[in-house]
Amino acid sequence: MLCAGVSLIATSCSGWLDREPSNATPTDEALNSVDLLDPMITGLFDNLQGSSNSTSYYAASFIVFGDVRGDDVQATQPAMRTSPLYEMRYGRSNCPNMWAKPYSVIRSANRLLQACDNLHKKVTLDADKALLSNARAQALAVRALAHFDLARIYALPYSQTNGETMGFLWLLKL
């Protein structure tokens, strides 16, 4: 009886169970409607904002990152969110991760730009073209902000390098 139950359970889903992962759809097939632009823009700004934990982007540590690390602010209280930045005392759980966060935002912006380029070939209505233009402008602005943030943190001053080095990787495509 046990063997019959196990064989019934093991074979009962084979006809209707989708075995392909839901995230296996290529980007240009998944982002194929102008109606998806608004949720994509919301996701882009949510990625820029982050959450309130200490490894977040604009919701937490980036706002004070330069000031605290440059001694403009003294964060000497041990319970403060900025004390690990001030003391430069990092571990796996509290690393500010200021390299990966902007690149995550840049990747999201590049995906939105790719979707806009793919949709631009398909849309014919002026209203849809205006939505595409708006989404494209927002993605370009957020991507530029993330690149600027990387330059503020990692690039050397222009006077030291005469503009010969960028200080970070410039990502304009996926």
What would you call each of these model-derived segments?
Residues 23-25, 125-128, 173-174:
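Short linear capping/connector segments at secondary-structure termini
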Residues 13-63:
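Membrane-proximal, proline-rich intrinsically disordered regions
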Residues 78-154:
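Conserved, well-structured interaction surfaces
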Residues 36-39, 69, 174:
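Hydrophobic-face positions in mid-chain alpha helices that act as interaction patches
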Residues 62-71, 129-135:
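Acidic helix-start/capping segments at beta-turn-to-alpha-helix junctions
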Residues 159-174:
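Short, flexible helix-coil linker/hinge segments at the edges of structured domains or between repeats
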Residues 1-11:
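Sec-dependent bacterial lipoprotein signal peptides
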Residues 49-55, 146-157:
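Secretory-pathway/luminal and periplasmic proteins that interact with or process carbohydrate-rich
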